[in-house]
Amino acid sequence: MALDSAAILEALDDDQRAVALATRGPVCVIAGAGTGKTRAITHRIAYAASIGTMDPHKVLALTFTARAAGEMRARLRTLGVPTVAARTVHSAALKQLLFFWPTVFGGRTPDLITSKGSFLAESVRRAGLTSSISIQNRDLMRDIATEIEWAKVSQVAPEDFIDEISKRLIKPRVNPEQLVQLYTAYESIKKQELAIDFEDVLLLTSAMLEEERDVRERVQDQYRYFTVDEYQDISPVQQRLINAWLGSRSDICVVGDPAQTIYSFAGATPLFLNTFTQRFPEAEVIRLSTGYRSTPEITFAANSLLRVGSMGQELVAFNDHGSKPSVQGFKDEQSEIAGVLSDITALLTAGTAPQEIAVLARTNAQLSAVERAMNKEGIPYQVRNTERFFDRTDVRDFLKQVRQASVIPAEDSQWIDELRSIAQPFLTGESIDGIAALLHLGRELDADPNFSPKTLRGYLREVEDRVQQNNPPTMPVITLATLHAAKGLEWERVFLIGASEGILPLTNSGNSASLTDAVIAEERRLFYVGMTRAKADLHITYRAEASRFLRESTLIS
């Protein structure tokens, strides 16, 4: 069926329509929070396909999370262009790398490391650092993984690591000399085990396209038109890969928001967004400024913060007026959490759906304290963090037991009881939300008349599909998330806790005066991201000294 180009444009506002009409690249879209950027870029692809400017089979639409890629695919299907390849940068690179591996590299394809934990633990042992680095310290091991990932996506070799660290605005929490030892050991172990990590996928695919002319020509023939979402968070190696895909052509549309650059610790840089028009002087620049998410009151505070840092596109709120964001101070963390939980309980009692509420914090440690309090009060919740759901130890152990039990299938009517029985031992302690979500998924499937077969094997098939799409199950409960993990999400009511000096902006020493301007700027962007997750109500709390960002956003004097 032919696409109706006029109908595609009717659903857009003036700025979004300008994006859709810019069917020839290069195009740069500066899109503020909640301005409908996904709508704009998917309609651009659909409109270009409807008028014959783009062949949808030759479009590669890139984003940075599986959830965002899935949303993009769903919207493109609805618009009548289901053949567009909408993928994460990593999945697109991995697909190409594995396809060409036998002819380019030869031998068996390497194993993909989805979690660095065991490799890093062995690296600590090989480097002889067990006396100074505890592999049981999850936060420390996560910091080490982050530093190695930063080095690799920034294309920094172990021998150059210390020199590059000295130039970095945000210093590592781990001793640089030890990091070099661990980085070297980690790379050696991977080579020995014939394994690659996600950073290797980007590096190897980039090198393959640069060095293998036949491969490059085949890939460039397959993909002619490019869309890159969240372009403010691109890393040097990701830009290198995009350059290899694009070649000498200019049919590219990038979308980003300088005010939401919050991943510098992972190698992301707004440099490529900010210099796009220098690389493509003929580029059309379009700004999306109508905010459809938040009330005018929340938008006003967010705009005030933007002006301080000259960070990005100011927004004009589309929605009706609501209540002004509230700010409340407490003497300590315990009283702060008690106050927040009291407000949440009142909302739930008044009929607010729990899935409309989120508690956002700067650090995982803050969320752990909230978890303990919610468990004590019996308030249901789920945690969203940057750790991949299906890589969690409790989730993997639970699914392993389900697989073992599925060998001897239960009767159709009994499978959900067996799943419940397997889950029961896991539903103790503090972090039970992952298993609870998997059990909730089972109940939903059991009640679905279209789900078949109603067995543990059928359940596992659904879970495996979700693993492939990185689409974890959720529950209708309150969400707890770090500010980094909350990016791209929204809730009716948001509680942003810990808006205190020393926490937001975060400092290891407790002395905010020691922070550089660059670090403060990124922390300010994090605060902006947190504020703009709220649709109707924003409640901000602090303890001791209020964050400077509260004054900058005019929420306190």
Regions found by a protein language model. Name each.
Residues 5-21, 25-33, 40, 60, ...:
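Conserved helicase NTPase motor core
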Residues 83-97, 115, 377-401:
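Conserved beta-strand -> loop -> alpha-helix junction used to position metal-binding or nucleic-acid-contacting
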Residues 1-106, 110-111, 217, 247, ...:
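P-loop NTPase Walker
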Residues 103-195, 291:
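ATP-hydrolysis module of ASCE/P-loop NTPase motor domains
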Residues 85-91, 197-205, 475-484:
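Conserved two-lobed SF2 helicase motor
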Residues 371-373, 392, 397-556:
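Conserved helicase C-terminal RecA-like lobe
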Residues 29, 33-41, 282-284, 290-379, ...:
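Helicase P-loop NTPase motor core
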Residues 100-101, 122-127, 301-310:
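Conserved AAA+ ATPase "sensor/coupling" helix adjacent to the nucleotide-binding pocket
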